Curated annotation (Swiss-Prot):
<dbReference type="GO" id="GO:0005737">
    <property type="term" value="C:cytoplasm"/>
</dbReference>
<dbReference type="GO" id="GO:0045786">
    <property type="term" value="P:negative regulation of cell cycle"/>
</dbReference>
<keyword id="KW-0472">Membrane</keyword>
<feature type="transmembrane region" description="Helical">
    <location>
        <begin position="310"/>
        <end position="330"/>
    </location>
</feature>
<keyword id="KW-1133">Transmembrane helix</keyword>
<dbReference type="GO" id="GO:0005886">
    <property type="term" value="C:plasma membrane"/>
</dbReference>
<feature type="signal peptide">
    <location>
        <begin position="1"/>
        <end position="27"/>
    </location>
</feature>
<feature type="compositionally biased region" description="Polar residues">
    <location>
        <begin position="188"/>
        <end position="201"/>
    </location>
</feature>
<comment type="function">
    <text>May act as a tumor suppressor. Inhibits tumor cell growth, when overexpressed.</text>
</comment>
<feature type="compositionally biased region" description="Basic residues">
    <location>
        <begin position="366"/>
        <end position="377"/>
    </location>
</feature>
<feature type="region of interest" description="Disordered">
    <location>
        <begin position="184"/>
        <end position="306"/>
    </location>
</feature>
<feature type="compositionally biased region" description="Polar residues">
    <location>
        <begin position="262"/>
        <end position="275"/>
    </location>
</feature>
<dbReference type="GO" id="GO:0009410">
    <property type="term" value="P:response to xenobiotic stimulus"/>
</dbReference>
<feature type="region of interest" description="Disordered">
    <location>
        <begin position="366"/>
        <end position="393"/>
    </location>
</feature>
<keyword id="KW-1003">Cell membrane</keyword>
<keyword id="KW-0963">Cytoplasm</keyword>
<protein>
    <recommendedName>
        <fullName>Tumor protein p53-inducible protein 13</fullName>
    </recommendedName>
</protein>
Amino acid sequence: MAPPPPSPQLLLLAALARLLGPSEVMAGPAEEAGAHCPESLWPLPPQVSPRVTYTRVSPGQAEDVTFLYHPCAHPWLKLQLALLAYACMANPSLTPDFSLTQDRPLVLTAWGLALEMAWVEPAWAAHWLMRRRRRKQRKKKAWIYCESLSGPAPSEPTPGRGRLCRRGCVQALALAFALRSWRPPGTEVTSQGPRQPSSSGAKRRRLRAALGPQPTRSALRFPSASPGSLKAKQSMAGIPGRESNAPSVPTVSLLPGAPGGNASSRTEAQVPNGQGSPGGCVCSSQASPAPRAAAPPRAARGPTPRTEEAAWAAMALTFLLVLLTLATLCTRLHRNFRRGESIYWGPTADSQDTVAAVLKRRLLQPSRRVKRSRRRPLLPPTPDSGPEGESSE
């Protein structure tokens, strides 16, 4: 049998006055759960992140939002699920299900998908429900002609858009679940990952996450799946939802045949470490998260052996080019300004001529022929005009 529905005063007392103590948590559905559970009650599971899975529903139940729990689950978890159900919907459907696993004994199903939870995460559940409803409404608008043939479409689980998961109730639940005094006595909460609920710093962070701004949402991405799940995959595809103040459901990957269900193919959702703790709703007027810090500039690369070898090769080629240019220039200059043999210093073997020998050799040389003037002489040459006249005779 489902846990009794809590009153709105109980939510207020749990969130603000802390009057919902461990005695009230343990009392209630314990006797009924023990009667229906074939074995002993399960202990509190490790606090892991929720995950989204596909579920097969009948055509008559395709529009229902159902809260499932295992009869052997801890009574505190059942009361958590009941508080969440009556905070999100006016007339919720709480149903026991023996196919649930011990690590995630709480499941929230809506429009063909299921959100499996180890502990109740109000922010996750509220955001997931509103996201599923928006996508379902967009799908109805796309198939309005087909739906008009079979009559009016079934109504939403709650009348009106603002009556599904009221913001104040969800925020009160998130605050109540984060309180230390609200936990059952004699139970030590175990967690997986870097979170440590037993430390005071982690508890303060969870309270701050319940009242502070939530991280931005990321769109669901689905890889390739089997042909049987193509129809369910198409129902999930669509434009990302509108602005919402609850944390988003992270990336979902299809894993067919995973354990933990009799008629559903399980999919694991990879969640960052800091988004698993329960949080509350935040008004849209609050400031958005700070933008990402700019990436640091790349450091300049140092010299490598290849760059050093290339530099040395370039220097060697430059030196050879300059040397070749100078050699060619010197050769040209030598050819242009080369002189003949000296009239004073003849080529001798020992190169030790004296001044007297040089003068004697110069005097013994035949006389050079006198150059004739190109001008025409005014008078004819006479017989005593000199050697030229004699030579002419």
